[in-house]
Amino acid sequence: MVIFKERKPTENLFTRKIPAKYFIFSPSFLSVHYFEFYLPMSGDNNIEPTSRGSNDNSNGPSNGSSVNSNRYSLNAPKYSSQPPPASHTYLPPMSVNIPPIASKSSSIYSLLHQSSPRPETPNPILPPLIGSGPGSHKPSPTPTQPPAQPATQRQPATYSVYPASISLNRSNSSAYPLSFKSEETLNNNPPTAAKRTNTFPSIPSSTKKQKTSQEKRISSISRRNTQEIIAKQIAENNKSKTIEEYAQIVKHAEIKVLSMDSQNTSKAALQLAEQNRERERQVFALLWLMKNCKSQHDSYVPRGKIFAQYASSCSQNNLKPLSQASLGKLIRTVFPDLTTRRLGMRGQSKYHYCGLKLTVNESGSVSLNNNNASLSLVHNNDPISPLSSPSPSSPSPQVPNVSSPFSLNRKSLSRTGSPVKQSSNDNPNEPELESQHPNETEANKLDSLPPAANNPTGTLSSDELTFTHDLIEKVFNCNDKLSDNYNTQILSNTEHPLLTSYKLDFPKIPAGVLPTDTDSDVISSLESLYHIHCNSVYECIKFLKSDNISNALFFSNSNSISPTMFNLFISEPLIDWVTKCDLITYTGLIKFFSQFIIHSNEISDSIIQKLESMIKLLPEQINKAVLELPKALVQRKLSIINNFTKLVKKLIKLLKFILNFLKSFPIFKSGMNNDWKNIVNLDDILEMMINEDDTNSETNTIMQHLQGFCQVFVTKFLNSSMSVSNDPSVSIECKSLNEMIKDFCSFISLQSKFSCLKLIDCSTRFRNAIIGDISLKSNENLLSWLFLNNVMGQLLNYCFEVMKFVNGLKV
């Protein structure tokens, strides 16, 4: 409560009696109390206000007006002229002029800004200081004359700033006046000291907040546990399916999320698809655990070994694995009675799951026998092995330079580094990994890779480079075939076929490049995870998913890779292996997009625009993704991606020429056929191109071959375009152009004994001579001839650039 006092500055309170106006503001700020206290003159301090007569105006106003009709006294001690003791504080006796009750509540703003003194009125507008209680809101009638009480009956005064009838609760505050009690009632029931209670709106305490947060955490954990239980039930219901069969279901869920457009799909639908994808990934992991692990009390298996085998299975089925922590939780879900121990020699120990055994998978793709992974604790006489049980959440302390106590022979690792079979040697305690392809040697595997994969730096120059004899196979034939409705799928965001059945084939980490004491589980896990990473990049770029490319390019940010794996990944011995994997990834993309050249019916302006916008952002995204990598590895990656972007830009230019030619060719194909028959003379052109003095030169030979190609295949192209197509989905113009492009690439493959640059030079000169004759004699169909000339020229240059890219040369 705040009390303000208002008086005139010229008045002297010690020479005369003047009214002092007090404004009392309730803490609720919803009502204002107004009082007039009459202070006595000096010398009248011994007179008690209650003993004065009805006509005594000594404490009244100076004009002699009577205010005794509304004057009541407060129970206050006598005021003495002597100074009070220091230990006591007394208030002077005062008479309270309680105004009559108003019918309306007053405004604080108007009371504070009144310019003139408040007129005395018999109708007060503010509530009295003391009412009949907080529950009484109706005013009581004001008595006409309060009875005077003898001084002997007065009780010792107890002054209270907040009378008991006034409540500080905001919810109980009101602008309406409270009913008051008569003085008789007050004297018979003297007021007691008001107890100050805080009834303001309560603020939640920190304890309540902690309880709420704890409840939220418990709810979140319960929700996660419920999801794991549901996933376990689904896995148990699908135990009859093989790993490969359920991998198709998981891939279907991943495709559904990948095919959704965030701009055209609702947030709820996108979240539902992502939740379904995560649940299917959990079910796949649980199903893999049920088929490859079993509970056995006297066996144990390294914790990293289980993840290595699981990641290898994901790599074989082209799936993204769960993190090691998530897989550990699922292991506890399937096998709740497991214990964790750190076993092994000092300096070479690591965490093991005790009571778990890896078994042979039914499909044989991921298998471990009892002798190489799950060893009996009964025969373990090592006094150091029984160590204290660590926390399940503790990371596995695996160091690249420290070998596992049961290290495997790296020379016999399979292509994925995971399949393990029973060794045929005499010592069963020394397991040996066996390749899925026993007849395929390491040299044969490396020879099957592109030339640049064997020699990333490249040994051939552009002048020495020749076209291969199987150019169509190298450039256009891709195992991941371009579907007939690829254009529709990309633009309509539908599901994409063949994504579940195709994945790139990558080399394993070569034997001998790493120290012999490197943990085999770490090597196997790193191989599988980087293979999955490269396949993920391939899928995102293949389906032009610019939103997902940024996340796919960050290999180090994956939850599955541990610090030990990352340190091994950035080590110098693995730079060449990483370069080979990257080159295979982007070579596969080039071969996939090159299929547009021989499938011209799938080319559209929308596809070209999306491909062009994605390629513009790709270099910047790569630069952000390689910030944490060493300089040598960054240079290799940037070199590959820069050549890839340049090559795709040249492909886009070629596709634009093909698209423009197909738009104009149906109109001018009849005129072009007449020009070819009546204007073009190939013998005259050959005579101008060859050098008669050197009939055995390469230039003359190439020119003669070009003349023979034009006589046969250009004539075939123009004649076939005039026929009727049997396939209504493909126009006759597209079909004719596709056939001529294939024929031209086959012709180039036959010229493998000539250098690429020499062949390009001769072809350009011969074509320009043909266009020159047509432009001089007839220009009606010149536009379409120019488009065809550019298509053939850009096609030859593009094939040359692809040969440079796969051979590791700068594009």
Swiss-Prot record:
DNA-binding region: 285-360
Residue ranges, compositional bias (Pro residues): 140-149
Low complexity biased stretches: 51-70, 377-391
Annotated signal peptide: none
InterPro entries: DNA-bd_RFX, RFX-like, WH-like_DNA-bd_sf, WH_DNA-bd_sf
Biased composition, class Basic and acidic residues, residue ranges: 434-445
Gene Ontology cellular component terms for the protein in this record: cytoplasm; nucleus
SUPFAM superfamilies: Winged helix' DNA-binding domain (SSF46785)
Family: Belongs to the RFX family.
Note: Present with 377 molecules/cell in log phase SD medium.
Protein name: RFX-like DNA-binding protein RFX1
Gene: RFX1
